[in-house]
Amino acid sequence: AASDVYKRQDLISTKDTFREILKKSKTSELNLYGFASDQSPRKNKANYWGVFLNNYVPIHTGAETIAKKYNMAVVFMDVQKIKRGYYEASFITITEEPKKYKDYEITERFIELLEKQIINKPEYYTWTHKRFKHRKTLST
């Protein structure tokens, strides 16, 4: 039942992500996975560097990798603050066919949407988070 959805939430550690998704992909259950994207990968583990808010930074690509491996849709959640304690989320489909995209194209689209969200409401962005831990400023 829809009311049971809150009882079936699981947090999956990074190291267990692939194993858990593989296990759940073998069932007939419908699953939704959300990825926190506010951290910077370790500098020596960064597979991809891209431009984010005029800084050249390492970017996690796990969501794109998993989407391609398991052929899962990728959706961006745009969250807007309505008033204190009230938020509204809308969902923007990036792709329903991730295997048709070149490497990092989905990640780049996600970054574009995130930048747009931040530029529209910069006061709600946590500027102190670790996204810029390993950055290189772009020259103009």
Listing of model-derived features with the role each one plays in the protein:
Residues 1-6:
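Short, small-residue-biased leader/transition segments that mark boundaries at the very start
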Residues 10-14:
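Short acidic-hydrophobic, aromatic-tinged amphipathic segments that line or gate anion-handling sites
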Residues 15-140:
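Non-catalytic C-terminal accessory region of glycerolipid acyltransferases
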